[in-house]
Amino acid sequence: MGCRFCASTQGGRVRNLEAGEIAAEIYGVMRDTGERVSHVVLMGIGEPLDNFDNVMDFLEIVSCADGINIGMRNFSLSTCGLVPMIDKLAEKKLQLTLSVSLHAPENTMRSSMMPVNNAYPVEQLIDACRRYQQTTGRRISFEYSMVRGVNDSDQTAAMLAKLIRGMGAHVNLIPINPVDGSPYSASEIGRAHV
């Protein structure tokens, strides 16, 4: 999706994984560790909602009683904010946690870091999150990478609080890691503990 502070996007997209390939990762971890996997986070290279059908099939495979039987509340699905797909996911009424990579509370700032914001501006994204929450009854988790001098001011924090007020959301403040070739650096240590 081309997020400019993310090392995962530097290799470019090759293809989406099939449902069985995603499930094979879980089974591989269980085989290698000898332990049952109880929680799954769909995040990292790729956009889960851009691979919707395979992700839904994967969830069915590993959550069913004949599979690993992981409870749906033990899944977290991350998205950069594909608004139509958030609405489509809401229709499924799954009890997973939706983690939204927000990273900025206003459009100019978010677009400079995340090109997807040009297609789905902050206001549309937050409206979709509110619809998701109303439909599923699930709290949204907002991922917010702290970038020095870009999105870590007190004013930006106040804008973020105003933007999501009344949602009962969780905000995960994440100091970014250094990425070769990126103009971004992590906020000072204390900024992520506002």
Give the location of each predicted region.
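Canonical Radical SAM [4Fe-4S] cluster-binding loop centered on the CxxxCxxC motif
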Residues: 1-20
